[in-house]
């Protein structure tokens, strides 16, 4: 069994659970045209928006609220139906998705020769460009084809020999093959770099929360942009910047490039028109972050400046005991305190959580609280009246949950 050539196959570095895409199987003849009609902007195909396990229903709500058709939560993400314009919009508009995959084809294969044959029928010419390098990532689970490297090689060879596109380990365009229970799903990663990389954040703290996760936690707390938000342990400012961008109706993908710009289906003029549609507004309130670390405050201010929302935010250095609500109506306090990863740390952190709870309970009447914690015991050390927590979500090698309150008395 031949193995992949060095530099062309990266292995199953990313694993996405497959769901059956829309589209016929096509024929072997006329490869360049045979399936092309399936992947045009006038046809619906399946689009998969990935998120962290546990956050699928929250992402589905966001996707549905932004007008995408047939949003459905599935393990690991959300599926929608649409064409290439919907792929572009999903990358540009959706805050909570980690990446956007276009489902190119789906078929059954029980051995490598069958995979090779079916891979040559995929409508590569309607998706990939012959002058743009690509790479392949593959994963196998519960299938008679079990060698992901050999499977990836078959896809790579099919693309090179039918389309002529070069393969490179550094390629921005990634073709993804998932074989599960002998069912093969072929997708193209249309995002490139993960979507939490908004394009503005150069400064981060030691344990950053990804912007995608922060936006979904804000949504879980009922935030829609119309109320103030305060983070008393703001780190590099992720919660506050996301809240300000939501309030200002700024597209999260406005400042970055995407892998779909290198695909055969890309229309630069249509994309430019889409980007030029203005939805921004001036928020009716401001967003506040504080942290005891002066370096964190400097990072937050720099990130807010690069994001273009510095005028809607305020960051100041201070301890938990110095936190007070800003003037105006109540809103949302959202905070991501230290988790205490090492043995013994959790006990040392209990006083911090108690102090946080005392400050919020005594000064923030009418405000709601969202607290991210890996240990229910630490969350409840605040003494705050939490509702049942959300499901555990993987984050930084741990599993964290969002603990929420209603308006504090």
Predicted regions: what is each one?
Residues 2, 13, 19-32, 36-38:
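Acidic, Ala/Val/Gly-enriched low-complexity intrinsically disordered segments
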Residues 41-62, 78-95, 179-225, 241, ...:
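S-adenosyl-L-methionine
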Residues 141-143, 194, 338-342:
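A short, flexible beta-alpha/helix-coil linker loop
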Residues 209-324, 347-348:
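Conserved S-adenosyl-L-methionine
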Residues 319-322, 326-409:
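C-terminal catalytic and target-recognition region of SAM-dependent MTase-like enzymes
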